[in-house]
Every structure is written in structure tokens, then in C-alpha cells.
Amino acid sequence: MSDFIGVYENAAPTEYCERMIARLEELDTTTSSGCRGEVANGGLGNRKDVSFYFERDDQVLAQETNQILDQALAKYMDEHPALGMSQFYSQVVKVQRTPPKGGFHRWHAEQGSELSSATRCLVWMIYLNDTPEGEGMTEFIEQGTRLQPKQGTIVFFPAAWTHTHRGNPVYTCEKYIATGWYYLA
């Protein structure tokens, strides 16, 4: 039986990943439109990261991201044909840098009762850099699965509670991802 976690290595070109990281760093020094997440203790994890929404801050890279995702999504849909019966779209391209010991380590699902997340059906994520073995893994509690970040790998998984997950900490490097959601139309 499938765990519905689609992992597609080398699906995003190295050059694209490097441009995404460079653009995030550039935006972080030239604009205030980024979102800085900082939460300490209180059971909420230790979140310290910076994110930019490229559909607002860099439409060219956002469009390129969607083209790359379309190719990998076609493979995922071949493996899960029932998904093709739904109409859905992705409009958010969130690019995120997590520093050593930062991140959001609390178990969570991407679909919730709030209007902004209620219609999320599928999560996508692109690892933009490698992390050392055992660092920065994405962990799924129900599936007992841990994914090691590897540059260019695209991951898809359902947004519902069945795929409750967390990002495990990096200790020796920064972790870069692009992420977003497919929404039911």
C-alpha cells in the first residue's frame, strides 16, 4: 500500500536551486517584505527562519517553479490517478531559510479549519540544498518516514492529518526549501 509520499530526486535542476537560494538572500538584504518566524519554547518549537513569497517578490522564479512542479506532479498523478478527478491549483511559492538549531519542530498538518488552509489538498516541497546525514530531515509520524534533504528533490504529500509531519533541526548548516500547497478549486 502506498504512503502517498511522492519523492522525485533530481527533479529540480541544480542551477535553479542555486538561483532560488541567491534570490532569497538578495531579498533578505534589500526588502522588508519577508516573513521572519520566531517562536521560542511554549511547546511551539524553536522557529527561527526567514521566508519570502515569490509569487509577490519574484514572479519569474515563481513561474519557473510552477513549470518544474508540473513535470513532477504529472508523475505523482500517474501513481495516484484518483487525484486527477479533482481540480486544483497552486499559487503560493514560499522560499525559506532555516538557520542551525532553528526551524519549526512541532508536529503539524498543512490542512486546517482556517479559511486559508481548509482547501489545501496536497503539499509540495523542493529541497534547495543538501544537509548532512541526519540533519534537517522531514519526518512523518504516521508513516514512520524520514526524508533526508537532497538538492533538487521534489516531495508531494497530502495536506491532511494523515500526513502529520515536522522538520527536524539542522545543526551545522542552513537548510533551504521552496514549499507551497495545491488547493481544491
Give the positions of each predicted feature.
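Fe(II)/2-oxoglutarate oxygenase catalytic core
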Residues: 1-154, 162-185
